[in-house]
Amino acid sequence: MCIRDRVYPGHHGGLNWGGVMVDPKHGLLLVNNQRLPYMQSLVSREKLDALGAKSFQEAPGQSKGFRVQQGQAYGATKGPWMSVLDQPCIAPPWGYISGIDLRTREVIWSRPFGTGYDNGPMGIPSRTQWEIGTPSDGTGVATAGGVTIIGAALDQFIRAFDSQTGELLWQQRLPAGNQAAPLTYIANGRQYVVAVVGGHDRIPTRLGDSIMAWALPQK
């Protein structure tokens, strides 16, 4: 027995996992958010056993896509609702970054977040920087100077946006994904940004083991 249903937003959010960034000086909340549907199925114990489904405790790292629910008559499978081309079954954008006015609670800007540079039909990277809007995992940092700095998207870029308008100010390609929030600080009168560039195996972004730093010009 198998009962299927679609979930939208999917299990990965809305705005789950990454959290939000707050700019109290300008009264803004910044958030990267998903538009990715999931398909989940209620599956009988017999079929789960036939599929070789294991819980995380039984097989760490091998439970992706299964909700085993040991001791129950049913478990579940779940995952993004994908086409035969290995692309989501709805049109892009699949992810946005948005600015919200905390006083009025209105979305003052929103734009697709992430390109298809490392993604495409059948898993073939498109190598284009068209902002299709990808799912993302991770958050960023909003500075007092009105800049939001964030990696998180599937295309291995880190970006800086104008927090008040959403204008893209800067971006740089990374050797792996940045799924952890960047850190910013000032030392000797100069502002720095530091990010862990380690990737994530379940997004997936490219894995790495780097810590990278950037600084504003001294003048």
Question: What is each PLM-predicted segment?
Answer:
Residues 27-29, 37, 41, 182-219:
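Blade-level signature of beta-propeller repeat domains, shared across WD40, Kelch, NHL, RCC1
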Residues 1-3:
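Short, small-residue-biased leader/transition segments that mark boundaries at the very start
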Residues 108, 167-170:
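A structural motif specific to WD40 beta-propellers
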Residues 26, 35, 94, 154-155, ...:
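Surface-exposed loop/turn positions within WD40 beta-propeller blades
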Residues 102-103, 163-165, 217:
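Short loop/turn segments that connect beta-strands within beta-propeller blades
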Residues 34-36, 145, 153, 196-198:
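Short loop/turn segments immediately following the C-termini of beta-strands
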Residues 7-19, 58-83, 87-94, 112-142, ...:
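Extracytoplasmic beta-rich repeat domains
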